[in-house]
């Protein structure tokens, strides 16, 4: 699909061919107040009051997400008009805008419309600009048109009728709207990569596959890449990481991707993604029900790859490093056992009380490795704990950080990106739950506050830099009839990096 911008100076009556230009459909928003403005006023005038008559007849009440198609409209170049309800104007929030936009796209996608002029981006969303609205509209459309069929014997190769979308914006917003198009497409491409990797089965998306994906990404976008194997990981003395992988026949990989968009000596932001390509729980075996979904335990790694792809496509002016420890967690005769004690790269000894708390074991060595980059900030992303799902459900990702400024940046980015996160506590008192009689630290702290103690464990390895942890166990994928990876938290991470690059 091709996205472009057309500027119209409504205040001066300059529509830049808006009414007469070739288009299969013009999308117009109507509030419950039924007051017409901007593009709607122009169309109403050109059609001799058609919109006014439709509204007065009660065919469009303006309620959020309601849609009405008008066919063979006289006086304009488009063959039809789609009216979309926007709800109450004084309550037109980010969420309501998203609901209205998705309703519009669903209506359009149910037709054979090939070219659309889209004016909903002009509607005044509270605390958001029209360029934000453009990007959100692109992401909504790409989300609705995403499909994963490559593992079927006959993949769906059909194409959508919709080919071209023109966003109509005020002349003053044209420059930023064009930037928003670039960002929206880049973000959607990054999310698609993240979703594709998550949706692949564990026998395809292995650690080696993730390593090869990183190499291809580096080649396509001129990134620097290193993919370390078993012997190199052993040489780095990553005993905690190796303890997780030793029960699997799949070799582990330690992936390091570097994007250089800023000054050569500028401190990078480091993203660390958990890459367990299949998690059985190891000797602490998981229940069989829904174990197939443990292919999604690499979604943290997938989000790092997707974010780096988006960052490279946007050409952001900062440096970013992606670190991905990736392996399987399998039971075997040589697998790590509950009660085993391993030594991390940092030198801390860890008593493995539960082999199904493996994500923190691979992340802690990656967080130690991150020190060599002298980072401006480190964010780890992991489908870490079921406890986070119990606490927050499937709407908010869990955010943990002792750095208030960094946490604030991430929360602001989550709101801007419509990719919500909620900050959870990281008080020192929780560390007591991780005490071990036999090692420096235990890898679990019991059932109470499970997501918090997991973050506390990771915090022991992050003292050298500002750090935040995102637990995406509840947000990285959906179950049931809509089963599939969501691409989150790529929007949050990308927005955080966009904001950092602008500083």
From Swiss-Prot:
GO CC, any one term: cytoplasm
Record-listed Mn(2+) 1 binding positions: 279, 356, 358
Its domain of life? Bacteria
Per the entry, which co-factors are needed?
Mn(2+)
Q: What reaction does this enzyme carry out catalytically?
A: Release of an N-terminal amino acid, Xaa-|-Yaa-, in which Xaa is preferably Leu, but may be other amino acids including Pro although not Arg or Lys, and Yaa may be Pro. Amino acid amides and methyl esters are also readily hydrolyzed, but rates on arylamides are exceedingly low; Release of an N-terminal amino acid, preferentially leucine, but not glutamic or aspartic acids
**Chain residues that bind Mn(2+) 2:** 274, 279, 297, 358
Which InterPro entries does the record match to this protein? Leucine_aapep/pepB, Macro_dom-like, Peptidase_M17_C, Peptidase_M17_leu_NH2_pept, Peptidase_M17_N
Q: Active-site residues?
A: 286, 360
* GO BP, one annotated term: proteolysis
Q: What class of enzyme is it?
A: hydrolase
Record's function text: Presumably involved in the processing and regular turnover of intracellular proteins. Catalyzes the removal of unsubstituted N-terminal amino acids from various peptides.
Cross-referenced NCBIfam families: PRK00913.1-2, PRK00913.1-4, PRK00913.2-4
> Family assignment?
Belongs to the peptidase M17 family.
Q: What is this protein called?
A: Probable cytosol aminopeptidase
């Amino acid at each position: 699909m091709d996205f472009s911008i057309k500027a119209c100076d409504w205040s001066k009556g300059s529509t830049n061919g808006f009414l007469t230009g070739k288009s299969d459909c013009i999308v117009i928003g109507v509030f419950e107040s039924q007051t017409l403005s901007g593009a709607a006023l122009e169309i109403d005038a050109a059609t001799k009051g058609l919109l006014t008559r439709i509204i007065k007849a009660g065919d469009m009440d303006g309620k959020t997400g309601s849609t009405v198609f008008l066919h063979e409209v006289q006086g304009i170049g488009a063959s039809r008009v789609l009216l979309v309800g926007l709800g109450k104007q004084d309550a037109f929030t980010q969420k309501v805008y998203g609901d209205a936009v998705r309703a519009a796209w669903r209506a359009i996608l149910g037709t054979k419309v090939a070219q659309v002029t889209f004016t909903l981006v002009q509607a005044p969303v509270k605390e958001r600009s029209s360029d934000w609205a453009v990007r959100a509209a692109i992401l909504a459309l790409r989300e609705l048109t995403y499909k994963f069929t490559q593992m079927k014997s006959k993949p769906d190769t059909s194409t959508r009728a919709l080919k071209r979308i023109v966003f109509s914006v005020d002349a003053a917003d044209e420059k930023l709207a064009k930037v928003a198009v670039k960002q929206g497409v880049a973000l959607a491409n990054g999310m698609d990569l993240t979703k594709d990797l998550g949706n692949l089965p564990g026998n395809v998306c292995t650690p080696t596959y993730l390593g090869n994906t990183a190499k291809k990404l580096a080649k396509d976008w001129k990134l620097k890449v290193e993919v370390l194997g078993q012997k190199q990981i052993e040489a780095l003395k990553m005993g905690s990481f190796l303890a997780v992988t030793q029960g699997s026949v799949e070799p582990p990989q330690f992936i390091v991707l570097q994007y250089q968009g800023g000054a050569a000596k500028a401190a990078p932001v480091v993203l660390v993604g958990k890459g367990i390509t299949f998690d059985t729980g190891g000797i602490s075996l998981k229940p069989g029900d829904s174990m197939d979904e443990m292919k999604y335990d690499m979604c943290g790694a997938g989000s790092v790859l997707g974010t780096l792809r988006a960052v490279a496509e946007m050409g952001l002016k900062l440096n970013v490093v992606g670190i991905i420890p990736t392996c399987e967690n399998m039971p075997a005769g040589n697998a790590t056992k509950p009660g085993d004690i391993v030594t991390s790269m940092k030198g801390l000894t860890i008593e493995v009380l539960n082999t199904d708390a493996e994500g923190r074991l691979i992340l802690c060595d990656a967080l130690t490795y991150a020190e060599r980059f002298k980072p401006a900030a480190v964010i780890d992303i992991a489908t870490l704990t079921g406890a986070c799902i119990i606490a927050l459900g499937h709407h908010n990702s869990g955010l943990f950080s002792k750095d208030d400024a960094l946490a604030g940046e991430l929360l602001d980015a989550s709101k801007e990106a419509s990719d919500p996160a909620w900050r959870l506590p990281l008080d020192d008192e929780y560390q007591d739950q991780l005490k071990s009689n036999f090692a420096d630290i235990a890898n679990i702290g019991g059932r109470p506050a499970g997501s918090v103690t997991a973050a506390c464990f990771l915090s022991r390895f992050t003292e050298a830099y500002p750090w935040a942890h995102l637990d995406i166990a509840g947000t990285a994928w959906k179950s049931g009839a809509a089963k599939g990876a969501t691409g989150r938290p790529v929007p949050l991470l990308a927005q955080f990096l966009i904001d950092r690059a602008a500083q």
